[in-house]
Amino acid sequence: MMKEKSQVMDIDRSIYDIKDVENDTYRIKSGLTPEIIEKISKEKNDPIWMQQFRLQALQIYNEIPTPDWGPSLEGLDMDNIATYVRPNTKMQNNWKNVPQDIKDTFERLGIPQAERKSLAGVGAQYDSELVYHNVRSEVAQEGVVYMDIESAMKGEYADMVRKYFMKLVTPRDHKFAALHGAVWSGGSFVYVPKGVQLSIPLQSYFRLNAKGAGQFEHTLIIVDEGASLHFIEGCSAPKYNVANLHAGCVELYVKKNAKLRYSTIENWSKNMYNLNTKRAIVEEGGTIEWVSGSFGSHIGCLYPMSILKGDNSKMEFTGVTFAGSGQNLDTGAKVVHVGKNTSSFMNTRSISKSGGISTFRSSVVVEKSAKKAKSSVSCQSLMLDSESRSDTIPAMDIRTKDAAIGHEAKIGSISGDSVFYLMSRGMTEEDARALIVSGFADNVSKELPVEYAVEMNNLIRLEMKGSIG
């Protein structure tokens, strides 16, 4: 029996596939050795404790095996990855001072416009270093700290960075956490003081331009008691015919009665291995909200984790994944209930077409101490043709009888009746299908600020654009 072919073409990535001429100040040789780690540390003028941390992380990396579950990582050879590439500029706090070639790339991606319209602060990283970082004066006056993490580590906030850095995600967590600990570079540090509630978001944008390189930024956010923050992360890269790697790390500390929303729109190119690690710990009465849109990369392994440590703490995860030709996106979320009366809710959508593979993994752990915990997991999958694949892999470890846990999963395809109805109202078949898919992913887009919801819906329309039949 002949397989049904996808009726849509792959994404038109022209805006994201801008390839700048590589004009780097320094590119370390490919591979992973103690000598390379020492060179990175020297280039970055690390404090002594960080030099030692990097070398210890490398040792752990060499001890830990590559994961034997999930998508195959055989195409990723660290001997061919340059782990540090410094662009041709120092970090600027005035957009006018950013070199024109780098500025042109970010301007095409809409970063300056977004800052002017709707953001309290912006960080822009190009390859291994931040090239721009700025925060509105009225936000800084409230005591909010938003700066590159390396300046924080060497300056006024050195003790705070050292206290929290890779304590939530340790190098021993898994092989790529250890890799991150050895070669990390760039990223942001955020501290929101007690009681400060930011009404507009902060954003960091990560752009990997260098061919055959890796990006390993570290984001550390501390939202103090009674404070609130919305942080947005965006990512993109041009496509090359060799593997690129993204293995960043995000550590989020949500204090008593604080609230943090962490939103991500990832549109890496389809030669990218995206092996990011994100984790939050939530104190009494605190709330962590994850909003995630994954549209790019060749291989993706993304499972944000939340530890609900305090009583009455909450977690919500809302995500959409779109896997097209040549993509294997293995995503999901994890939660550990520790405190009493804690609650978690996962609501995800996955879309696959043209032979794409999407896998949703959920992990719910309820400790004995987590009396009256509540957890609900919902995953819906939409396959646009018979070439594609969608899997749901739930895992639950419930150690108390005093908990309410639920899980549901649905897999389906686009209804011909729905397409016919929309076409009878004047739509083309292509537009009808795109509208249905956009509606399917509405759980994420409605949670984003309008500018980012528009970007996400544009990505969906681009994925669906193409000839019919």
Regions found by a protein language model. Give the residues of each.
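Extended intrinsically disordered or low-complexity segments
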Residues: D12-Y16, K340
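Conserved beta-strand/loop scaffold segments within soluble protein domains that form the structured core
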Residues: Y132-N134, E138, E142-M427, A441-G469
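Short, Lys/Arg-enriched, disordered terminal segments
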Residues: M1-K5, I468-G469
